[in-house]
Amino acid sequence: MLREMLGCCKVYISEARNKTALEAIERALKPFPPAAIVNKFEDAAYGRVGYTVVSSLANGSSSSLKNAVFAMVKTALDTINLELHCGSHPRLGVVDHICFHPLSQTSIEQVSSVANSLAMDIGSILRVPTYLYGAAEKEQCTLDSIRRKLGYFKANREGHEWAGGFDLEMVPLKPDAGPQEVSKAKGVVAVGACGWVSNYNVPVMSNDLKAVRRIARKTSERGGGLASVQTMALVHGEGVIEVACNLLNPSQVGGDEVQGLIERLGREEGLLVGKGYYTDYTPDQIVERYMDLLNNS
């Protein structure tokens, strides 16, 4: 039964260089078994780390997952100052994005309930403007739409980087939880629930951001490309720009299809395209890793 009643939460934090802060965030989860971190993906160029947290939701108990993630969020807000942060990946806050996914036989309603409860606590206790999206929000609004309204995709520093604290003293979009006043040092948080999303990034060996943006645009559903694919072109170190892809329906459109299209578009632009990579495991691999962690603990 345990194997069939698991919830997954991905927590994206705007930091990758401050090891002391990251270690504190990881320690914060430990008092809440059976919650466990099954994957950590750090990217120094982006100034971003993604944690994949899994816990049992059996017998109606979701407190372990919620409490573990809340502790990680609180520690991140206590140890990281957005005003000192810079990176080539957009962000709206210290804790930029939290997404819950059902694993195995767990329902989207179960993880949506956890997401909603967590968001209310972040807003009311930590006093950070918090936005709900996907199945956790009554209108089913998308993460993309919230980000666009809050200016997520507009870099604010030369070199196509995002740097410093949140630009506004008041958020222009009323949050689902928390105040409209926003701390420059903390920013805002988006919390949602949805089916599985895979992140697949493809490096293009170029400094021509306009050309890679054309490739990214033509790859995305929004630009007439692949269904259920969202993309951004992001500088990723010297001489490399990545087409960062969200695969919203990876069972239908996966990394191989994305890779093939970007390679073809790259040839049309006269650019060399490298082999892409996933930033996380598949749901089945995550369940397997979690069960191994439990059995070996």
Curated annotation (Swiss-Prot):
Arranged from A to Z, the UniProt key words for this protein are: Golgi apparatus, Transferase
Region Formiminotransferase N-subdomain, annotated ranges: 2-196
- The UniProt record gives the binding positions of folate as 178-187
Its catalytic activity?
Answer: (6S)-5-formyl-5,6,7,8-tetrahydrofolate + L-glutamate = N-formyl-L-glutamate + (6S)-5,6,7,8-tetrahydrofolate + H(+); 5-formimidoyltetrahydrofolate + L-glutamate = N-formimidoyl-L-glutamate + (6S)-5,6,7,8-tetrahydrofolate
Q: In which tissues is it expressed?
A: Expressed constitutively in roots, stems, leaves and flowers.
Task: Give the annotated active site.
Answer: 89 (for formimidoyltransferase activity)
Gene Ontology cellular component list: Golgi apparatus
Q: According to the UniProt entry, what is the EC number of this protein? A: 2.1.2.5
* GO terms of biological process kind: root development; secretion; tetrahydrofolate interconversion
> What's the main place this protein lives?
Golgi
Q: Which domain of life is it from?
A: Eukaryota
Q: Name one Pfam family in it.
A: FTCD_N
What would be an example GO MF term here? Answer: transferase activity
Query: What pathway does this protein act in?
Result: One-carbon metabolism; tetrahydrofolate interconversion
Q: Which residues form the signal peptide?
A: none
Protein's cellular compartments = Golgi apparatus, trans-Golgi network
The UniProt disruption phenotype note reads: Delayed root growth when grown in high-concentration 1/2 MS agar culture medium; in these conditions, roots are wider and exhibit anomalies, such as swollen and irregular cells in the root transition and elongation zones. Slower secretion in the root cap peripheral cells resulting in a significantly reduced monosaccharides content in the culture medium.
Primary role: Involved in the regulation of root growth. May regulate sorting and/or transportation of trans-Golgi network (TGN) vesicles in root cap peripheral cells, thus influencing the extracellular secretion of mucilage components in the root cap.
What protein family is recorded?
Belongs to the formiminotransferase family.
- The name this protein goes by in its record: Formiminotransferase cyclodeaminase-like protein
Provenance organism: Arabidopsis thaliana (Mouse-ear cress)
